[in-house]
């Protein structure tokens, strides 16, 4: 299946950087799907549905494997979104101080030729240090994590906020579980290492 094109259904520069680690040429497309949660939809159901929807929403004219991914952050059973501004980022980090949060990342690979979609969910736990208000404000002002779920960038200074990380793939926390992606691509006939 070496004639398949690899497409990332995302405009996220973070996901693009992660996919570049696999050293496979790929293109990106902006997915076109409604990301509104359904009534009574669990975080796991939401990320799986959205990952599949993103992968399937791209208009493709050649045989391609299209990657879709979606992530939510959950604290005390509630989905935490992107803060979008300083005040909300500080509020999120204050609520997360000394707490554990869970990231659920849905991943899907859609084969545009066969119509088959393979998907999975990866879970990653983040345990926050107890943080002072001054530490939180200093972090937010330095890194401005306004478009990151949970109000931090784990690939940057955000690592200073954590006491412990739990999960099989640290890439999951940034938004694209590469270990699972390698498996899903192999199931569709694309071997990362040839």
Swiss-Prot record:
Active-site residues from the entry: 70 (proton acceptor)
E.C. no: 3.6.1.-
Catalytic activity: N(7)-methyl-GTP + H2O = N(7)-methyl-GMP + diphosphate + H(+)
Xref: Pfam families: Maf (PF02545)
Keywords: Cytoplasm, Hydrolase, Nucleotide metabolism
Cofactors (names): a divalent metal cation
InterPro entries: ITPase-like_fam, Maf-like
Biological role stated in the UniProt entry: Nucleoside triphosphate pyrophosphatase that hydrolyzes 7-methyl-GTP (m(7)GTP). May have a dual role in cell division arrest and in preventing the incorporation of modified nucleotides into cellular nucleic acids.
Matches recorded under HAMAP family: Maf
Name of protein: 7-methyl-GTP pyrophosphatase
């Amino acid at each position: 299946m070496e004639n398949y094109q690899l497409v990332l259904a995302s405009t996220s520069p973070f996901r693009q950087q992660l996919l570049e680690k696999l050293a496979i040429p790929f293109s990106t497309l902006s997915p076109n799907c409604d990301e509104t949660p359904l009534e009574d939809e669990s975080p796991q159901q939401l990320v799986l549905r959205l990952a599949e929807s993103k992968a399937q929403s791209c208009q493709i004219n050649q045989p391609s494997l299209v990657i879709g991914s979606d992530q939510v952050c959950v604290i005390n059973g509630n989905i935490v979104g992107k803060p979008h501004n300083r005040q909300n980022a500080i509020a999120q980090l204050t609520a997360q101080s000394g707490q554990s949060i869970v990231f659920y990342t849905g991943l899907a690979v859609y084969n545009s030729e066969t119509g088959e979609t393979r998907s999975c969910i990866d879970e990653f736990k983040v345990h926050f240090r107890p943080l002072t208000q001054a530490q939180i404000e200093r972090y937010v002002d330095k890194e401005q994590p306004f478009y990151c779920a949970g109000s931090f960038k784990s690939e940057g200074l955000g690592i200073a906020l954590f006491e412990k990380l739990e999960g099989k793939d640290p890439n999951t926390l940034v938004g694209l579980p590469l270990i699972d992606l390698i498996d899903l691509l192999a199931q569709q006939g694309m071997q990362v290492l040839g």
